[in-house]
Amino acid sequence: MDYNFNLEHPFFFTNNDYSTDTSIKYQVSLPFNWHEVMNNDEWVYQYPIGKFVERQGWKIHISSEYNSSHELLQDVAKICHEMRIPFKHLSTEDKFIMRNGKLVSRGFSGKFITCYPNQNELESVLQRLESALKQYNGPYILSDKRWDEAPIYLRYGVFRPSRDDEKKVAIDELIVGDEVVKDERLPVFKIPKGIVPPDFLNKWLDKKDKKQGDFPFIIDNAIRFSNSGGIYNARLKEDGKKIILKEARPYTGLGFDGTYSSEKLASECKALKILNEWSETPKIYWHGKIWEHTFLGIEHMKGVPLNRWVTNNFPLYEVVDKTKDYLLRVSKIVEKLIDLTNKFHSENVYHQDLHLGNILVKDEDEISIIDWEQAVFSNDEKVVHKVAAPGFRAWRETLPSEIDWYGIRQIAHYLYMPLVTTSDLTYNYVSQTRIEGKKLFESLGYTREHIDYVESLLSYLDSKCPQIENISRKKVLKSMHEIRTIESEQDIQDFIIKLLRGFTLTYGQWRKEFQSRFFPVHYYGLNFNQGIAFSDLAILWSYQQLAKKVKNFKFDDYYEIRTQVINEAVNNFKKSSLSGLFDGKIGTIWLIYEFGEIDRAVELFTTHFIEIFENSQNKNLYSGQAGILLVGLYFLSKGEIDNKLGEEILIRLREYTLNYIENPETFCKVGASDVQSNDPYENFGGLLYGHAGVAWLFGEAYKLTGESIYKNGLELAVDKELVAYKVDSN
């Protein structure tokens, strides 16, 4: 899922509308009898007053490189004005950069201007645009096919919403004959089934894009894709040598510093050439251009990412830490990282993106450093650390060398106690994790000598990073240095009270600045406010559960806030398009019931259950039918619904179970997930997203009904879940 979020606030995730876009605007003159409108902050529309525009047709998309974008817009606008062709363009340079960034959806990227000609105008406007724009460059728009030499692209799609006298369909649906077809925006050119192109387009459709040269490598599989291109496992044709192949599409991956992915790939190539004699950095086996894309083929370095090495080796428990060698191994790795950093700095190479994923560990704890695309080659001026993994972003403007040392410092602290992500919010947070790390290793029986040596390495790396006093309009948040040991019930009470006070302080700070919702939330939840994962209702319920653990804790205005939050959830109930337990309507109903608003919850459930279930597209616990049915069973067990609705729930439950038993693979992925992500819409395994959640549903169904079909479903779901698991050798 694409998330609209902003990182400029010092404490909270916010929507993109939090900050004012002060970048340069794209503007064109408005002729007489034309109208201009800005329906959102991304696009500016211009159209001739009184002209009929077809509902759908061949869209003309135009891309541009950043430096010539204003001039290109003027040339396109002149033609559209003269030919009375409606068009839209991006509103500001910041929007342009985001549309061409590395992480933007490949189905949307690159589109700077869209023209909406009626079909009888299409050929002539294409000819004029091609003649006027030949001298310009721009990224290839993956959802379209290029018209000729200029950065002009076409795809068939929706132009505008349906009018009152037309067939009513959604804005993302096409009318093809008597059928309604989805207007898919995919990163591949595709003509919707049933669309007959005009004659002059058929020759164009048969024409292949010009490609030059033969691939000197064989691609085995893709590691990942981005708007900038792919990263692949590949082999050289010449000798079969395994390589990592990196691809850069031209004029993509644009950053706010004005550099493209091809320039970043060139930086990586330059860095690796300078460091070519090292065994700890990849060798270059092939570099060049094929068609319009740049490729870099580098050595396939052995080893596992350092974060995975920590997962496999960190000694949380005495029973799995018999050798007591973890700190010795950490010392060895950190010493090597310090030595390597000094060596590449002596060559005037500065990595700028050092984090756990870019350090590989192989046998005998030998290490290598990969992903040099952010590398710079001067240490003369202070810069802002723009690209960084969570917990590894250096604070304030600083020298490139100090950015690298900050990364090494954070890595070392992570090896000692793997909790550094909060460093982006709390300055010097690792001073706190260091205390806890020392306590842990003392409790596990590590020697004073080993602990002190690692501590000395941490102190050395701390000294390599500049100290700061202030970071924003707020004083720097300090880390907590007090050592806390939970030894009694009163200690637990005191700790909970501190958490609750922190909650109330955070709530107060948030409400001073924002009215869009009651509580701050992770950016995964910014765009919806229903369900038990990220809604205001869920956050307040969690607070309430915590407050029940202590005596006489008072939150001013709690009952007033509770009433407002519940009313807000009910008032916005129908606006939500999501149905699930964690992200949608059924979760909201359950929360309202748990708050004691039983009549309101039962009314919502009785009125909307069938609709919620039928509209759900997923099968899992988090956002799909398993979670919806689980809440249905909950209400059945409470005796809160009539027999007719109860029968409807059980009918759907039985049908769901039979379908699962027949073909569980269509419900959830069987085996390990292809993607490792915290994003709830990219995850396909475990309790919330996989067969374990389905098993929970069947277990509750068996407890309630005693019917063997649910026991059979439970056993099958557990078996399917366990396919993805491995036995821990420890």
Protein language model regions, located:
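Structural motif at the C-terminus of the N-lobe alphaC helix and the adjacent alphaC-beta4 loop
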Residues: 270-281
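Helical subdomain adjoining the active site within ATP-dependent kinase catalytic cores
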Residues: 120, 125-193, 410, 414-514
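C-lobe/activation-segment region of protein kinase-like
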Residues: 373-440
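Juxta-kinase regulatory segment immediately upstream of eukaryotic protein kinase catalytic domains
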Residues: 2-23, 166-221
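Catalytic-loop of the protein kinase fold
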Residues: 341-361
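Short beta-strand micro-motifs within the conserved protein kinase catalytic domain, predominantly
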Residues: 283-294
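ATP-binding glycine-rich phosphate-binding loop
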Residues: 24-45, 50-52, 195-238
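ATP-binding glycine-rich loop module of kinase domains
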Residues: 55-66, 218-269
